[in-house]
A protein has these predicted regions:
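C-terminal beta-strand-loop-alpha-helix "lid" module of Rossmann-like NAD(P)-dependent dehydrogenases
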Residues: 1-267
């Protein structure tokens, strides 16, 4: 009987310790969530301003591309536009790229399973052959998942910090843009959990490349003029890749925010 009481006391003590550890982990996750939410809001302000500037700078190229698509001609001017702003140019899709963002570890509730389940359904619905798509993975859970199923994993990155910086993930975003530019895939979707609030996230598959979120009609709403040196083409060749990189980084920030929220509620 004494031994039985001792066992009960040990279980009670063990349960209390587990509760203390879980509470501490929840507090840490909550602090990280608060920090990254503040940073994500600041980044959104920056991203919106960059988008506005890029839209103004690329307005001429966007109009020429639209006119070229409507007339369906192969003029010399059209090739000039494509060479200057290739990231804007839609091309026949022979292969689709998917950049899938998951966590490196568990204890995040259904965060990873939601993304991976939705991804497998997308592949099943949209592709008949494994040759039609290529995978890129941010996070060990996703990378291991795709490898275990024999999917074409062209790139993986593990160990993104809890509060990522652009310098930290520069390799990821530059690799994605370079692979698109080199024709490894003809369009890129970034797939992740979008942070709605602490209790809710929603799966997103956003088309990032070619750049398609620039609306020329917005230019008419402002009277801003830019002084450009040395010339517009040179500036666009530098700015457009950076803008594409900023879109991908924004998705990584959003996904990381959703991860911390999931970790907080899972405790």
């Amino acid at each position: 009987m004494a031994e039985s009481l001792m066992d009960i006391k040990r279980k009670i003590a063990s349960t209390k310790k587990t509760g203390q550890i879980t509470q501490a982990m929840q507090m840490v996750s909550g602090a990280k969530l608060s920090q990254i939410e503040k940073r994500a809001k600041k980044y959104q302000i920056y991203s919106d301003k960059v988008r506005q500037i890029v839209t103004h700078l690329a307005a001429g190229q966007l109009l020429e591309l639209a006119n070229a698509a409507e007339s369906d001609t192969d003029s010399g001017d059209k090739s000039q536009v494509i060479s200057v702003a290739s990231l804007l140019q839609k091309r026949p899709v022979k292969k689709t790229g998917y950049l899938v963002i998951t966590s490196d570890r568990g204890l995040v509730g259904s965060y990873n399973s939601t993304v991976l389940k939705a991804m497998m359904q997308m592949i099943k619905d949209d592709h008949e052959s494994p040759d039609d798509y290529v995978m890129m993975a941010i996070g060990g859970v996703g990378a291991d998942f795709f490898k275990a199923r024999g999917l074409n994993l062209a790139y993986e990155y593990r160990g993104v910090s809890d509060i990522p910086t652009f310098n930290e993930v520069r390799e990821i975003v530059k690799t994605a843009v370079t692979m698109f530019d080199n024709g490894v895939f003809d369009e890129l979707y970034v797939c992740y959990n979008h942070h709605v609030n602490t209790l809710t996230s929603a799966f997103r598959a956003e088309k990032m490349l070619p750049i398609s979120d620039l609306d020329v009609s917005e230019v008419a709403d402002t009277n801003v003029e830019y002084l450009i040196e040395p010339d517009l083409d040179s500036v666009l060749e530098s700015v457009l890749p950076q803008y594409a990189e900023s879109l991908i980084f924004g998705a990584i920030m959003d996904a990381k925010t959703a991860e911390h929220a999931a970790s907080t509620t899972a405790m």
